[in-house]
Regions:
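Elongated scaffolding segments in large macromolecular assemblies
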Residues: 2, 9-14, 206-209, 213-216, ...
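A residue-identity detector for tryptophan
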Residues: 35, 41, 177, 188, ...
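Short linear interaction motifs
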Residues: 130-134, 179-207, 223-224, 229-236
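Generic structural signal for short, flexible, solvent-exposed coil/loop and linker residues
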Residues: 141, 177, 200, 205, ...
Length: 315
């Protein structure tokens, strides 16, 4: 296949939270492998474009991203335990371990953890022996944090097979998703919402299949959505991540920009942190000065015991 400094990522639709996080994960993985990638959005239908400093083929992009994923996976040691019932002391132990690493490794490990748990956000009904911290906005699973960690482990499980990983990443990035993988889901893809009334099959045998490569990249991309504790007050949610906002007291929405000029992960983080991203009606003139042409927003809903993020809409 022809080498190029730009690759259109046909699999990553702009109105899908999983696809957006996958884009962030791709950039992080390539950075971890020593590249200096950028991305921007263009065309009809709208898709992100990966820009590289040197011409590479799609196969080289996927293989290098797989190598970067293996490097990034070292930051997810907190997911190795069978259950995710962290006490305050256990979380402090993880944070101290990150501090004792090199500055870059420590920041990466802390960022990966903060997307799912932060020290200042305690559970409302704190009980001995139970998980001490509030649910992350990105946690859509109904069985508590043990479900979350089990799903993270499942997403990381095939990383030892570099060629298989590269093939899965290429499918997720360069082709329309077929969702053929029978794996666990973090439920960041709106297709995970399945209605079972009048279904020909039992729900347990007719669950939504996944695009595993996209889920893998999204795990790493989520670390750019740094978590923090909120003031709480009357809200039931005391934990937000970058790009998210509270709605209706306890609901949560996640917003992300569409930018027209090549940006790195640091630049994208800065856009996510812009105050205009959380406004009901973002000021288009202000955002246009930052090359942002649109803002997409998805809402977390609970149709049953599991949450899911809706298809995003332009606001």
């Amino acid at each position: 296949m022809t080498a190029s400094t730009e690759h259109r990522l046909e699999g990553l639709e702009p109105d899908n939270l999983l696809a957006f996080l996958s884009l962030l994960g791709l950039l992080r993985a390539l950075e971890a492998a020593g590249w200096r990638p950028r991305a921007y959005w263009e065309g009809l239908p709208l898709r992100p474009v990966l820009r590289l400093r040197e011409a590479k083929t799609q196969e080289q992009v996927a293989l290098t991203a797989a190598e970067g994923c293996t490097v990034l996976a070292r930051n997810y040691q907190f997911a190795a335990s069978g259950e995710f019932k962290l006490s305050i002391d256990q979380l402090k132990s993880h944070l101290e371990a990150a501090i004792n690493c090199s500055p870059a490794e420590g920041r990466s490990a802390d960022a990966c953890l903060s997307a799912f748990v932060v020290e200042g956000s305690l559970a409302k009904d704190l009980k001995p022996g139970k998980h001490a911290f509030a649910r992350s906005p990105l946690d859509c699973l109904g069985g508590g944090q043990s479900d979350l960690l089990s799903t993270l482990r499942d997403g990381l499980s095939l990383l030892g097979q570099s060629q298989s990983t590269a093939n899965a990443l290429a499918k997720a990035l360069f082709a329309v998703w077929k969702r053929e993988d029978d794996r666990k889901s973090l439920r960041w893809d709106q297709s995970d919402y399945r209605r079972h009334a009048y279904s020909a099959k039992a729900p347990t045998k007719d669950h939504a299949r996944q695009e595993w490569g996209a889920n893998l990249l999204a795990i790493f991309g989520s670390s750019l959505l740094l978590g923090c504790a909120t003031a709480g007050g009357r809200s039931k949610l005391s934990f937000l991540v970058l790009g998210s906002r509270l709605v209706d007291g306890s609901g949560v929405e996640v917003s992300w920009p569409i930018w027209l000029h090549p940006a790195s992960t640091s630049g994208i983080q800065a856009l996510l942190a812009h105050p205009g991203m959380s406004e009901d009606q973002p000021n288009r003139d202000i955002l246009a000065a930052l090359s942002v042409s649109a803002v997409y927003r998805a809402r977390k809903i609970w149709p049953n015991q599991y949450a899911v993020f809706t298809r995003a809409e332009v606001v």
